[in-house]
A protein has these predicted regions:
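Short, surface-exposed terminal/edge motifs of secreted or surface/virion proteins that either
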Residues: 77-83, 109-124, 159-185, 215-217, ...
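Extracellular/surface-exposed low-complexity repeats and stalk/linker segments enriched in Gly/Pro
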Residues: 86-92, 132-160, 185-186, 387, ...
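Repeated scaffold domains used in trafficking and secretory/extracellular systems
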Residues: 52-69, 89-100, 127-136, 254-265, ...
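N-terminal beta-propeller domains
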Residues: 1-84, 133-140, 256-330, 408-420, ...
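Beta-sheet-dominated scaffold domains
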Residues: 306-461
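Surface-exposed loop/turn elements that mediate protein-protein interactions on large endomembrane-trafficking
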Residues: 42-51, 77-88, 111-126, 276-301, ...
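Small/polar beta-strand repeat architecture
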Residues: 4-11, 123-124, 130, 141, ...
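Short hydrophobic/aromatic-rich beta-strand motifs
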Residues: 70-73, 101-105, 152-174, 203-209, ...
Length: 461
């Protein structure tokens, strides 16, 4: 019996030599994956499973996470630094800003000094309870105890003359050299009462209110403190005579209500959507936002002309950036007299994605409404074509060793944790982690998830 001759089939082998990551697009390239879970590009060009995470803490009612020389977070109305409770704060979501040794918590305005453990506040409000005394004095607080009050020149030239014949009244001193009464250009008033200067300092700008018209209405308003002690302050002013009152006097060091805050060049910078303004604190002094003495160290305020609320703030290569949905404002200059604010129309930060602003190397990344953008100082460009046409929102970002971690929510309210390798341009999807905040300490990334767990992302110890 003869059998038919069979033709052998030749086999073929396809070898993929390069991993191209996550590409959620029609017909992804060979080496790319439409769906992905727990994959990393750390071993590029090879595909590899991501490193396991290490759970460090489980927090109750956390408000955020950050890092200086140690991890910091808020939990149940307490600020923790390095695992130790260091200050009281309100509950709710927080923004952390580092300025020198200070860690500042917004919107509370509470400051913790990581070097010496000092705790204080940006704002301060003192209201008197009892008698308030007002005394004409010199800049150092020394009272003018011996002077003549009259409309015309007094015969006694050894004393000061409080001239009531001029408008406004003034204080004069006789000069033996010129034989003339010379007006003292600046006079001061000491306001003394129990606790009136508590937690205030020389150089603070405060709002004074409650001074009776019969005492000196001009003492109400914005005042620069020349001297400050717990029970007395000295301000520029004038009195016809020593006076007192029992009505309460209020001294308040105010800070603007800020939507977003960053630190740059030893100043805090913030913005207010309600006022459509940008603010900077006094140089090196986060407690003073209303000091306008014509000095290079002054505070700064400017209104912007763009429409819509601010959606985020960041610092990139020494420049402060304030974002809206369709533009960014960039601050130039080194002091209030030469500060300038420019506007660039572009894809700004998506509302609700302020936490996506993240520096990786010299490039700023953020989530815009139509994708993930990279900004190198010129014009933002999209780097998220691989994510396809899926709409994402509420993005939160962190970084580790040149990689951008980005946790986002899709239109179906499902969460995704993506990782973008900024060196290779490869995207990976790790899992469905819902990040509330990221922090980077000693080159390692940490994540606070929506369940209150703090994770060390990679590698696990």
């Amino acid at each position: 019996m003869r059998l038919p001759k069979l033709e052998g089939k030749t086999g073929s082998t396809e070898l993929n030599r390069q991993f191209l990551g996550y590409r959620h697009v029609d017909a992804p390239d060979e080496g790319a994956f439409y769906e992905m879970e727990n994959v990393t590009s750390e071993r590029y060009p090879l595909m590899a499973p991501r490193s396991p995470r290490a759970k460090l803490y489980t927090l109750q009612n956390p408000g955020g996470l950050c890092a200086k020389t140690a991890l910091a977070w808020t939990e149940n109305g307490k600020l923790y630094y390095g695992g130790e409770a260091v200050a009281d704060v309100s509950e709710g979501e927080k923004t952390f800003v580092s300025m020198g040794a200070w860690l500042i918590v917004f919107p509370d305005g509470v400051r913790y000094n990581t070097a010496d453990g000092t705790v204080d506040a940006i704002g301060q409000k003192n209201v008197t309870d009892g008698t308030v005394n007002f005394t004409l004095c010199e800049a150092d607080g020394t009272a003018y105890s011996d002077y003549t009050v009259s409309e015309t020149e007094p015969e006694d030239t050894t004393k000061y003359w409080l001239c009531t014949g001029s408008d406004p009244h003034c204080l004069k001193k006789y000069s033996a050299a010129t034989k003339l009464w010379n007006t003292i250009p600046t006079t001061y008033v000491m306001i003394s009462a129990a606790g009136i200067g508590r937690n205030l300092a020389e150089g603070d700008t405060v709002t004074v209110s409650g001074v009776l018209d019969s005492v000196g209405a001009d003492l109400n308003g914005e005042m620069l403190l020349q001297q400050a002690a717990d029970d007395a302050v000295v301000v520029v002013g004038f009195l016809d005579e020593t006076a007192s009152q029992t009505n309460a006097v209020t001294l308040e060091r105010k800070a603007p209500k800020l939507d977003y805050v960053v630190e740059c060049n030893n100043r805090l910078w913030g913005c207010s959507s309600e006022e459509n303004e940008i603010y900077a604190c006094k140089l090196g002094d986060a407690t003073n936002w209303n000091c306008f003495a014509g000095l290079a160290t002054d505070s700064y305020t400017v209104s912007v002309g763009s429409d819509g609320p601010f959606t985020g703030a960041a610092v990139q290569l020494g420049y402060v950036l304030f974002f809206k949905e369709n533009c960014l404002h960039k601050v130039y200059g080194s002091k209030p007299s030469n500060f300038q604010v420019s506007m660039t129309a572009c894809e700004g930060v998506q509302p609700g994605s302020a936490k996506s602003l993240c520096m990786v190397g010299s490039t700023l990344y953020y989530k815009a409404d139509h994708g993930v953008m990279a900004y190198d100082g010129s014009v933002p460009e999209s780097v998220s074509a691989a994510l396809g046409g899926v709409y994402y929102q509420n993005a939160v970002a962190g970084t580790e060793r040149g990689r951008l971690y980005l946790s986002m929510q899709d239109a179906a309210e499902s969460w995704h944790l993506f990782v973008y390798d900024t060196e290779t341009g490869i995207w990976c999807r790790e899992d469905a982690a819902h990040a509330a905040a990221f922090a980077t300490l000693n080159g390692n990334a940490y994540m606070l998830d929506a369940d209150g767990c703090v994770w060390k992302l990679t590698p696990a110890e």
